[in-house]
Amino acid sequence: MTARSMDIVSMLAKEDVPVMGHLGLVPRKSTWIGGLRAVGKTADEAYELFQKFKRLEDAGAFSAECEVIPENVMGEISKRTDIVTVSLGSGKNADVMYLFMEDICGDTENPPRHSKAYGNLLRLRDEIKIERLKALKAFKKDSISGKFPGKKQSSNLEKKQFEKFLDQLD
């Protein structure tokens, strides 16, 4: 967060635009902190994170997505801020628990450690992919061999109407 970003949060909040911040791991900025990792793993880093929460709160944000923050740190920060804390991989001590639907439904091959799959959509997608390929190959084969389209998939003018049509063409 920069001083300018807090000015923007403040400006938006003063105009009654709800602002939700994003603290902890911010994947697009992960190279700045040494990669995809928990944020707040030392006392100093946890306190710095707490200060960011307070600055966000003071600027007028109503909430913050709290991504991959140690659970005990998240619990203490959540107790000490009035903004709604939304845990994404930050344990159960935030105000709201959040996961991506893809993770909940088991729709990813390598889900993040902090997620939990409650279904197995990936298996179903694989089955759909196999069935789709089977259908497309059968369609190609029938199209090349002349089996498709067949009489059931085609229509013709009745004989007199077709002859009239041919006369009109000439």
What is the role of each PLM region?
Residues 1-121, 125-170:
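Alpha/beta enzyme core
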